[in-house]
Amino acid sequence: MGGHSSSDVASPRIVEGAEDARSASADRDDDSVLLRVENLRKEYRSGLQPLVLFDGLNLTVRQGEMIAIVGESGAGKSTLLHLLAALDRPSAGDVYFASTWLGKLTAGEAATFRNREIGYVWQLHYLLPEFTALENVAMPLLAREEPKPSAFVKARELLREVGLEARVNHLAGELSGGEQQRVSLARALVTQPRLLLADEPTGNLDNRTAEAVFGLLERLHTTHRLTSILVTHNMAMAKRCGRTLRLHEGRLHEVWLHSSESEEASAEGRIASSDAPGHPIVRTAVPGANRTGTA
């Protein structure tokens, strides 16, 4: 695309169809691309008319990126993560993880793929209450028949990384909400995945605890050399990611935010007001700079 005037660069913008502007053929030959989504469509049958969540959605994620996905409730953000993790199948279109086409995987192959390549953190921790923190974290390793001593060593190390070394033998129900989410994060990383998917990982936490958990997530993203995609309604956290993508009307739109607080507030207002029908989304070629930090 062409150059932009200083007025174009001076204010935050929302990039319409940012992923459509990428060259699909170039991405296929780019070794830095970890995840590629092409012309994704997802619909559900509801009566006579289908409910279409996505149609022609495209996404390219490169290794090491930390991406936030924002959008109004019901836009399909959680469904998109399910498709990226092969927990669900698209109605049309393709999802590629490195050189693997997820559409060819059987249910068993998809389960193995998730166990080895994907770490998943939900808003609800889904820990097994009758097991200790150590046992919960070791579960993905035990599921693939790794010997218990080895699995427990790795689980203990992850719990140390998330600051819960003193709580390894506590039952899940004996932990606070923040501690439970830390255990969930340790469980997601114990298999050394390349991709971390987090669906509202701080949504059930108070502000102080949410900030601590998100800071931990940032640090682990760096130390474990992860590629991370987070769904969040928290714009302050989204701004700390390398890219922010807004899911709106079945497409992803890149949101570019300046570091200036006044301009970021203006951008948040644009995003909020753009939920109204007919709101124009401005196209610009300026990408977001990498703002991923460590805590």
Where do the protein language model's features map onto the residues?
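ABC-family P-loop ATPase nucleotide-binding domain
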Residues: M1-E43, E254-A295
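Exposed, low-complexity/repetitive linear segments and helix-based recognition motifs
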Residues: S5, R13-G17, A24-R28, V52, ...
